[in-house]
């Protein structure tokens, strides 16, 4: 926030221009992240975006009350201003093709089209007017915050998109009900999102599902059934079985289907790319390269729907692969980095934290439900200064003091130091608390000599000395 609102924004170092051109199809989280790292490497980057604004699902799928668009737009603007060229309103197959990009002299192409097509509800009559997907509904509201879904709305599904659609619908003044075929505990949405929807007045009808939709005189009639939980499937999840004679009808203005998302098969066909068994682009998972060509893919079109931070990470990964390709280097996955951990809290010897005081964690403050349900103001208000300070003080400061940028992990990875091969006994440590001002923790000592200088200069005592 400080950087966004300052006059001098952070600007990364941009390498000397290489003369190489990279086309990126899609300006969502993954595509924008890849563009950032490619422009920093000195390559010319052009993004082809289907919508009129960049940001992808962050722009059109995450509601304003969760992600204020003015913040998102500022961050995107900073990336674009690094020298990235972006063209809006471009549709794959209609305006651009792989062959066309090759003719224009692009040295590499990155496909980052996301997974924005809605999965079918598989309900009779779901194609009638008034039935809309969760993705399309959220996009319409993002473009027109005064969009009117009518007085009564049903949302079908139990994931985060269903919750977002329901919480958005209720902000537009609609009496909103979620229909979910399983129990509340089995809803795939984040628990805190379900709680928030409850607070805002969204009704949740569990063990209920639509089976038929008809339209009469501008109203939608939905025939629903009650479900009961059956046997567990191979994944351990209980199946849902229709209860005989449990049919009931609802009359609504809009039905929002939000049971999942998938990759556009039309786009995949236009690129002549082979999809995998789940309809996603078949690319090397760790590099994003498709075969041995100059074509790459990243983000949700490769992995399926997920969280934005994962898509951004894959965008960076793809950019690194493209940079290697353009430099004539072998495109291969980054070696798995060495990770060392002391384990979970219950696995750590008690002497490491017996003297540490337990302090409460602060939850982010929120607008009260009655103050937010009629508007799109940001719900989470962030920490107050005192809360932020006390949260920061929860850090145990257990890191290495030798250097800010520790190279030990990189060196262990480079030399392939295997903890199994170099296994030894677990080292135990002692604590010396005999002095009133100084506590010596041998597990933290890196022989830097700071304690000696501190005791001599500040405390004017030589209780600690350094011996070579």
Model-derived features: positions:
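Non-heme iron-sulfur electron-transfer modules
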Residues: 1-14, 124-135, 274, 279-280, ...
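Glycine-rich dinucleotide-binding loop and its adjacent helix/turn
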Residues: 1-16, 74-94, 118-172, 276-287, ...
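Iron-sulfur cluster-binding cysteine motifs and their immediate structural context
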Residues: 1-2, 53, 84-86, 393-418, ...
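Ferredoxin-like iron-sulfur electron-transfer modules
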Residues: 7-25, 30, 59-60, 90-96, ...
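N-terminal Rossmann-like FAD-binding beta1-loop-alpha1 element of flavoenzymes
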Residues: 20-46, 161-170
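FAD-site-proximal beta/loop scaffold in flavoenzymes
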Residues: 127-151, 234-305, 347-350
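A conserved FAD-binding loop/helix module that cradles the flavin
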Residues: 165, 298-329
């Amino acid at each position: 926030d400080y950087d966004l609102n300052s006059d001098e924004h952070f600007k990364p170092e941009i390498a000397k221009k290489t003369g190489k051109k990279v086309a990126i199809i899609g300006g969502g989280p993954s595509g924008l992240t890849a563009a950032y790292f490619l422009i920093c490497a000195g390559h010319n980057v052009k993004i082809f975006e289907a919508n009129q604004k960049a940001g992808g699902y962050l722009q059109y799928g995450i509601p304003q009350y969760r992600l204020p668009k003015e913040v998102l737009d500022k961050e995107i603007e900073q990336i674009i201003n690094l020298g990235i060229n972006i063209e809006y309103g471009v549709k794959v197959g209609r305006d651009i093709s792989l062959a066309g990009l090759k003719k224009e002299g692009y040295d590499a192409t990155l496909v980052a089209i996301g997974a924005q097509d809605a999965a079918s509800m598989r309900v009779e009559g779901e194609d009638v007017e008034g039935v809309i997907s969760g993705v399309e509904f959220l996009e319409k509201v993002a473009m027109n915050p005064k969009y009117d879904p009518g007085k009564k709305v049903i949302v079908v599904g139990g994931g985060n998109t269903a919750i977002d659609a329901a919480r958005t619908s209720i902000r537009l003044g609609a009496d909103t009900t979620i229909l979910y075929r399983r129990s509340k505990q089995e809803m795939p949405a984040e628990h805190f999102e379900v709680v928030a929807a409850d607070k805002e007045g969204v009704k949740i009808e569990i063990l209920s599902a639509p089976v038929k939709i008809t339209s009469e005189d501008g109203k939608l009639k939905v025939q629903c059934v009650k479900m009961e939980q059956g046997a567990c499937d191979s994944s351990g999840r209980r199946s849902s079985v229709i209860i005989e004679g449990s049919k009931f009808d609802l009359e609504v203005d809009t039905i929002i289907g939000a049971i999942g998302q998938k990759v556009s098969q039309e786009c995949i066909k236009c690129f002549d790319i082979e999809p995998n068994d789940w309809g996603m682009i078949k690319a090397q998972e760790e590099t994003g390269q498709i075969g041995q060509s100059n074509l790459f893919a990243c983000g949700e079109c490769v992995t399926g729907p997920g969280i934005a931070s994962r898509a951004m990470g894959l965008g960076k990964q793809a950019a690194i692969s493209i940079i290697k390709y353009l430099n004539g280097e072998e495109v291969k996955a980054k070696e798995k980095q060495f990770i060392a951990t002391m384990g979970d809290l219950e696995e750590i010897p008690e002497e490491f934290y017996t003297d540490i005081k337990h302090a409460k964690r602060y939850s982010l403050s929120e607008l009260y439900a009655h103050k937010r349900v009629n508007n799109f103001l940001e719900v989470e208000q962030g920490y107050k200064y005192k809360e932020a300070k006390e949260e920061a003080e929860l850090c145990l400061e257990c890191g290495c003091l030798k250097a800010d940028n520790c190279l030990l992990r990189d060196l262990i990875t480079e030399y392939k130091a295997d903890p199994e091969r170099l296994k030894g006994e677990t080292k135990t440590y002692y604590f010396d608390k005999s002095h009133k001002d100084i506590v010596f923790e041998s597990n933290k000592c890196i022989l830097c000599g700071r304690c000696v200088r501190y005791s001599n200069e500040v405390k004017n005592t030589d209780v600690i000395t350094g011996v070579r």
